[in-house]
Amino acid sequence: RLGLDEAVLGMLLLCVGVGSLLSMPFTGLISGRFGCRKVILVSGFIFLAMLPLLASVESVWLMALCLFLFGASIGMMDVSLTIQAVFVEQAAGRAMMSGFHCLYSVGGICGAGGMALLLGFLAPHLAMLVICLFMIALLAAFGRHFLPYGSEGETPLFVVPRGIVLLIGVLCFIMYLSEGTILDWGALFMTAERGT
């Protein structure tokens, strides 16, 4: 639709990573001030607002902005959902994090399968709209059950990671770099080379 070469496409895809990278460090602070429930809901609605735009914009600069906001919303959701999971785990008094991550993956599989099924019956823009409306309904229905916890005290804007936290951060960086490369370029390869 935009008639992009691989260099411009690569720069556009980089906007997703830049958005995530810039939003993640501040999500903890924002969640502490306003509560992670609000952050989850706002980032979720931004994410869902970007999906139809990504399927329809015809300007490279507007696409770059949408991809940046898309990435920022994903980064904020990842961090705030993990904070929420920690609160739920603490309230339950038992280890639940691995189960949450498992359900995250199951949700991804169901979403991809549902979209593939819809594409068999509907035009891509309409299928995207159906998925977005379904997700908005889920957020509206279940978002009120998220724990609203924030922090009562003052928290620093940024803390330099040390020790095991720094090591985990480096591992997460490598993991996200690999995941992003496979997801972005793998989808393009399947479309261009395999026609799927």
Per-region residue spans from a language model:
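Symmetry-related core transmembrane helices of the 12-TM Major Facilitator Superfamily/SLC fold
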Residues: 125-144
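Pair of pore-lining "gating" transmembrane helices in MFS-fold secondary transporters
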Residues: 1, 68-69, 162-178
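MFS-fold secondary transporters
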Residues: 50-54, 70, 142
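Short amphipathic helix-loop junctions that connect adjacent transmembrane helices
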Residues: 1-7, 184-196
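Flexible interhelical linker loops that connect adjacent transmembrane helices
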Residues: 138-169
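Cytoplasmic helix-loop-helix junction between adjacent transmembrane helices
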Residues: 67-102
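Short hydrophobic/small-residue motifs within alpha-helical transmembrane segments
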Residues: 17-18, 105-110
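Conserved MFS/SLC helix-loop-helix module at the cytosolic interface between two early adjacent transmembrane helices
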Residues: 22-61
